[in-house]
């Protein structure tokens, strides 16, 4: 065995001399040992394939089959001195130090990130940054860290706080992969090196008391995403707040993207309103996915409802073919969503069929809750534009801007009228001014032909002049469900 290995792997003569010193007995083989006549022996190139030594990590257990191989266990750290022929010649850094050949299929290169689970290792930190960290609260004298060396590729440095200054020590690597601060004191790894100098700190004149505490990074809002993650596709519509587009998130997830019109919005209040939206969770509310508010235009990204808004859907052939049960189903679902907002003390301010979205299976969800509060005062005014939703707005809100859950109840009554007229515009033929005048004189929308009498009674209750006399959404929800059960 010895002559064969010395002849085939002559460049490892220093290693063979350790195994078979001069005058030693030759190895005539042991039971189960590698037979050079029957088993292939790796042939390593004369020149290394890459700069060595390199760090490897054992992926699987391997049991040596001859004296030239190295037994390793999964997780062992290895320092590879040579590589080739499907093997590495490596020194084990953990456990009992020894060296030998290990199949390359059983190991993987270990980058410095392998140390990232250690509290004292700071990847990507420069010498200057290490000083800033160690001298910043809550760190005190004795705080230390290991970082990649700036002057030695693949090497490390030890930085230690000593009162009001920071001392830096180069961690050198010996030819066999051992690490040291001082020649003559070799360690198989960084952990062993630190353990030694914690106990013998006087050798470097600075105690190693505790790992450096990283400064807390600013808390990142997981909802906030860059514009680059979203691609606009088909334009779905346009409203008071901006345009609505069908789009893709990260190239795969279909979403609805509301592009906010900054000219009409009080963007200074947008962050606060979005915080409210993030905390609302109900199956009858449109689900918020993400926000892009780091620059203009602002995106509000929500789930995509395939059939669009309820007002437009009711005017399609599919919508006009619906009979009483699904229409009552729409009313019940909207009442459920609004009852939840009522419990959360959130005022919608712009409840209408156009702000209810429909998906496959005729599931519907309330959208745009709370955004009307962000419209600039000169935009949200009954006299400013015929586009403003005065016909859906309670008189106290239209005249005096007094919004409440009860003004939402008024709007819900108008939404019910839309549902049972298959999306027709309420107060058709009247201007905003005429509508308000007629309402103040006591006029109320007539009962639609498709509307049950008991539902129309609820509409009239929603349109009571005194807000306090209007029903709650919880009451409306229960009454509508009872009516729905009578019309299965």
UniProtKB/Swiss-Prot annotation:
Keywords for the protein's UniProt record, in alphabetical order: ATP-binding, Cytoplasm, Kinase, Nucleotide-binding, Phosphoprotein, SH2 domain, SH3 domain, Transferase, Tyrosine-protein kinase
Residue sites binding ATP per the record: 236-244, 258
Sites bearing Phosphotyrosine, chain numbering: 380
Domain SH3: 51-112
EC number annotated for this UniProt entry: 2.7.10.2
Catalysed reaction equations from the record: L-tyrosyl-[protein] + ATP = O-phospho-L-tyrosyl-[protein] + ADP + H(+)
Family matches, as Gene3D superfamilies: SH2 domain, SH3 Domains, Transferase(Phosphotransferase) domain 1
Enzyme class at the top of the EC tree: transferase
Active site positions: 350
Keyword Hydrolase: no
Domain SH2, residue spans: 120-212
GO MF terms, alphabetically ordered: ATP binding; non-membrane spanning protein tyrosine kinase activity; protein tyrosine kinase activity; signaling receptor binding
One Gene Ontology CC term in the entry: cytosol
Position of the signal peptide: none
Variant or mutagenesis effect after changing residue 258 to M: Loss of kinase activity. Exhibits a diffused cytoplasmic localization. No effect on interaction with KHDRBS1 or VIM but abolishes tyrosine phosphorylation of both substrates
Protein kinase domain segment(s): 230-488
One GO-annotated biological process of the protein: cell surface receptor protein tyrosine kinase signaling pathway
Tissue specificity: Highly expressed in most breast cancers (at protein level).
Description of how the protein assembles with itself and partners: Interacts (via the SH2 and SH3 domains) with DOK1. Interacts with KHDRBS1/SAM68 and VIM.
Function: Non-receptor tyrosine-protein kinase which phosphorylates DOK1 on tyrosine residues. Also phosphorylates KHDRBS1/SAM68 and VIM on tyrosine residues. Phosphorylation of KHDRBS1 is EGF-dependent. Phosphorylates OTUB1, promoting deubiquitination of RPTOR.
Notes on the domains: The N-terminal region regulates its kinase activity.
Family membership: Belongs to the protein kinase superfamily. Tyr protein kinase family. SRC subfamily.
Name of the protein: Tyrosine-protein kinase Srms
Organism: Homo sapiens
Gene name tied to this protein: SRMS
